[in-house]
Amino acid sequence: MEIQFGNQRCRMVNSGGFLATDGSHLKEMETDDVLVEFLNIEHQLFIRNIRAIVKIADTTVLPSASDKKLLYYVFDETRVRINDTPVIFSKLEEDNANVNEGSKMGVMTVPNTPQKPNLQQQKFEAINANEDQIDYSSNLEQNYNSLIRQGSDQVIPLSRFASEKSALELEKELFSERIPESQSAAEPVLKVENSENDLDEKLVLDGQHVEGDHSSDTEEEVVSEDQKQLNKTDDESTFIESHQIYIQGETKSPSSVSQSLSGDPSLKPAEVFDRKQSAEINSPIEKDVNPQQNISDSSIKNNSIHSDEVNPEVRPDLTPSNENEESKRSAPEIALKEKESTSQDESNREAEEAPISTNYSFPSSSLEDQPDKNVQSSAVENKNKHTNLVTSSFNLTKPMKSFIRRNGLRVQESVTDETDFVILGSPPLRRTHKFLLATSLGIPLVSSQYLTDCIKSGKVLDFRSYKYKDEEAEAKWGFRLDDIHRRTCFNGKRLYITKAIRDSMVGDSIHGLYSILETSGAEIVGDIKRAQEKDTIILAQPDNDQEGRNMSATGLNVYKIELVALSILRDRIDFDEFLIDYDADSPTKVIGKRNVSKASRTGQGRKRSSRSSWNKPSAKEQRT
């Protein structure tokens, strides 16, 4: 399978690989710069180990926690974007051969994913989710709930990462063709038009399930059906009224409902209220009504039998003015308002379910995606509620992870301005990337004993009382660990790094060096012409660095790479300490790209060979 990430293409092997930030590099070691990991199992593509913003179709997938990597199935011809960059998957001919070979051997089965769950389990859950909670007595109610049960047998609900078919959409597909095309003009329930939305609204408002094929109904049968609609039983009218009251957005207490239905002594107020509650829970109207449907107020008013008998004492907070406004509200407006509140609750739940250990920095979004002031203020409030920490040369144990999760602490992957403190491992101190970043930003350094004492006390202690100490490192490198402030020694400085240093750094070490210098306020120049400008600091290696030797021969000062780390620790640059003198290390001098010693240039000390010119006989001697 071939993957195109932006403008770059790369071929993925059978088992899969990693996609890194510096390009489409697959089948490499897993590092901090890996965006996603792809798995190619039996010609089916999966994504896991997500550290980027991934969108599969129109669904945003949350990043993966470090201890739990979910598989997300990518359907064929599905739009996938990683960090807002489109990704295109192309199948190759050898993929089909590998699939046939793997199917013969039976080596692997496709695992279950949040988007491709166990079908039997999901079907069982779908049936249980729509089970009747009340034993309905009327045939009309049983027909309406059988409609929902029949719909649940036809659809397999997916997870919240994928879109689901609603019960109302299922009714459109199953029963829209069975509704008679010709309706009586004297029908008192709803004026039926040719659109599918109005037909579905009639099904929901009437609460009826039209059975059989009525495409060839006669006019007499339609009139008889309308007459049957006018002569409904009391139970059927009660069930329909409960739905009509909910659709119009009116809220009734059990007493008001019982007063409006006082003509039927067989129904108690508690039973009517329970049926209304069950109708609100099981009815698909709340989430599936299309807000774009154009339903006239007159049709809803005709549909409601007892809408004019609502007791005004039930809503004492309504004045006569806003009572009229409340009665004019239509079902689409109520559904749209409830849909907005539901979507807001879902977005808050997704933010709470984000993995704790995932704090990966991504490219800045466009202006259209910038949050408004309210979202920014809420983000600041969330930041104040949590304490962010980073560990360096120290591994968290399971009790520590559970304590951090319970007490609102957050573990970041890298050091940022939002980091509150950094936990270091036991001495000796190591000059790691996170340690140097924390020192440059002025972030406190804390001993690993801090978390141990927090677990013993059962609460979050003050980390300022657990300062990290290593006197040997302080004496060796000439700095103080308790000197916590933002470093400014590299502000406005330009640095050039030779190719020998860049090639010697493995993996992401060179990117870590760049991030440390940029955080400290330095500028990295890559042009050798700019390296020859005044006040440019040139970093090179003392040995095996021809570029550094040539620059030193032209009169430029060249320094060791240790200048960066120790200058950040001390907050000053000691140029003389890190200056490289190639002439003192070796007697050779640089001429172009060749090392020519003084003896080789003067010819002194050269051994005469037997083939020297004075050892050869002259031509006259050879003739004699």
Swiss-Prot record:
CDD domains: BRCT_MDC1_rpt1
SMART domains: BRCT
Residues bearing PTM Phosphoserine: 253, 283
GO BP of this protein: mitotic G2 DNA damage checkpoint signaling
Record note on disruption phenotype: Strongly resistant to the microtubule depolymerizing drug thiabendazole (TBZ). No effect on DNA damage sensitivity in response to ionizing radiation (IR), ultraviolet (UV), hydroxyurea (HU) or camptothecin (CPT) compared to wild-type.
Basic and acidic residues biased stretches: 200-217, 225-235, 306-316, 325-352
Quaternary structure (record): Homodimer. Interacts (via BRCT domain) with hta1 peptide containing the S/T-Q motif in vitro; this interaction requires phosphorylation of the hta1 peptide at the S/T-Q motif.
Job description of the protein: Involved in DNA damage response (DDR) mediated through its interaction with phosphorylated H2A proteins hta1 and hta2 which mark the discrete foci of DNA damage.
UniProt domain comment: The N-terminus adopts a forkhead-associated (FHA) like fold. BRCT domain is characteristic of proteins involved in DNA damage signaling. It is required for localization to chromatin which flanks sites of DNA damage marked by phosphorylation of hta1 and hta2.
Protein name per the record: DNA damage response protein Mdb1
Gene: mdb1
